Amino acid sequence: MVRRRGVVYYLYKESLRCTEGKEKIMRTVTLLTNALFAKQGEAFAPVALPHTWNALDGQDGGNDYWRGVGTYQIELPAPTKGKRQFIEFQGANHVATVYCNGRELGTHKGGFSTFRYDLTEAMKPEDNLLTVVVTNAKSDIYPQNADFTFYGGLYRDVNFIEVEPAHFTLLKDGTAGVFVTPRSNGKTRIDLFPVNADGHTVTVDVKDAEGKVVATGKAKAEAHTVIKLDVKNPHLWNGMADPYCYTVEASLCAGIDVLEVAPVDTVTVTIGYRSFHVDPNTGFWLNGKNVPLHGVSRHQDRQDKGWAISKADHEQDIALIKEIGANTIRLAHYQHDQYFYDLCDHTGFALWAEIPFISQFIPTKEAHDNTISQMTELVAQNYNHPAIFFWGISNEITIAGETEGLYQNLTELHALCKKLDPSRLTTMAQVSMVPMNSEHTYITDVQSYNHYFGWYVGDVEDNGPWFDKFHELNPDRCLGVSEYGAENILKWHTAFPDNHDYTEEYASHYHHEMLKTFATRPYLWSTHVWNMFDFAADARDEGGVRGRNNKGLVTYDRKTKKDAFYIYQAYWTDKPMIHVCGERFVDRAPDERDITVYTNCEEVTLYVNGECIGAKKAEDHAVVFKNVALKEGDNAITAKHGEVEGNTITVRPVAEHNFAYDVPEGNQGANWFDDPAAVAARKAMKFPAGYYSIKDKVGTLMANSETAAVLKDAMGKILGGSAFGMMDAKKQTDDNPMSGFYNMMRLTDLMKMAGKNVTAEMKQQINDALIKIKKD
């Protein structure tokens, strides 16, 4: 405990001691848990570390969260005589400049990787002050623009480290200075980087999961020391089925005869022995067995915490992802906490790890160098994790177009990954409109696309044909689905789900259709839902919710699993389960009384108020009981299969549809419910069968002269000539790739892109004109 300016600081200290009863402390790691913090121009105040200054304003909408400079002051422990001191930051977003007792130690650019500085020469016998100036303001550092909040601050652990003068380097790209390359046949190469180690010896022990030494070796310590070992018949790391891990304990000892000499430094890393490859027709193979990769993407933030989350938060996320039955995680869109990678090693998830080279390409040297730096740190710091299989070099980076500078940057990142780590594969997530034959689809080892057919554009049924066409045109390319999803807001409900209605029911329908699509396409090497959890995106304001992307299968606070969660569990897990959908869809009008059940059982029986209604066989892991009879008042509904019983929901019959379940026009959700008269006055749009409407695709509307005339008069004024020109269905997509993208969009989606320029009244007028025109 230390005291400064009337504030008490508690420090956590971890000591690494030598083995076999020797009591000499080799290195100490002290977790710094408190600081003084001030925004630019404001007074300092105590905060707990980890810390972000955007925990609340980064999630409340308005695209106005504070992006600027924050300063931290942290008192350091007194140095131990004869040792060297280092400071370690595991995450400081975006740029951090570090000072010790007023001496500048350096600046780190990149908000997601570990970095360290040597404090030794700046330290005093006591009263040492660390000052860290952090900024998340815009600069030539990635990410620049993206659909998530960039939380500022020291949001991960800060550690004070002491080591002997001779130690494994702490200054090699934020790593532990020990890199292990294990082969599935047991051949093991260890690259070690000791410093100040003349006259020292490096020893290495490989231990199995029970702690038994299965291989050992030693070598004279050199600046780059290489030791090669052979583990006989290694127990393979086999994903979720058997994530068996070994540990490598590397020690640095003074002298040549080290049997009786205590090590001066020891580093322990986790490894796994495995082999894998990806086939363009059959997908992912692990240790000679075909293992279809199906899983989720994950953002690291949480409600009211932002990125400053705890180990318990990481553990809960892992547990939820395991519960749904996933076997792969795309850790988007940046390097995640080392603790989460550790959890994945021991749980068995196959990981895609990536850098935040996202959305907007910056054609400057500083930005280019930052991609190289962030990729180097990502690969180096995560080299030993058996869970990682793929390095992601970018996400939707061609949104603003494909340029030669961007292409060169991407090819350089691919080459860098192969140089640093030839044992893994590279990938990238393409935005949907990238042509199937774009040169960008051939940069990385395997390819993935972010596709939202059925949400942003087109229909959910468009996904399968697109995958098939790509596979036909590129039979030797491995294709994956890096993102897909639909907004899923718990307060909106319908018995007639439709694209962009934001209801829980449409999201469930969408995800079920995607699962059916994937089930018949074994050539997809991976699929990753966007997203496992709702996350903050302060610029968002849609579906009656501000500041949030609601595509998660679990809510932002991790308290509620949405209905769509359970269709995945039904497909992906073997333990018998039953889930009755519609828990939040309580009021049911006469035509809204179907009950849907998700299950991995062959058959389920429905019970209403304890009475057996009947049994039905599951089809594609779902059962729909049509027009279930309800009594007045509350009705308790559940489903069973033998000893397996699902959840119980409560529904009640009402005479008419409850309009409180409908997302309002203009996304002003809160306003509708403040004034009941406004709800009653709403005019529902009509979409008569056999007639055109704003729900039709732009390409369809432009192909008909009458409907095209309606659009030209109405939309030309809003979008302008150039944007309207891109909508022309007669243009060749080779000349203008964006035209194909717009043609697949529903007119409602294009209106949405126009934002507030398209009012509810304008939508109504355009739709009224279109529904007068009969389809051929």
List each language-model region with its residue ranges.
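Compact, charge-rich alpha-helical regulatory domains located at protein termini
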Residues: 681-759
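Death-fold interaction domains
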Residues: 752-776
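Short phosphate-engaging motifs
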Residues: 94, 336, 707
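Substrate-binding/catalytic cleft of secreted carbohydrate-active enzymes
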Residues: 318-321, 328-560, 564-571, 575-589, ...
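Secreted/periplasmic carbohydrate-active enzymes, especially glycoside hydrolases
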Residues: 1-331, 343, 348-351, 374, ...
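Long, contiguous interaction/targeting segments characteristic
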Residues: 86, 94-162, 497-569, 574, ...
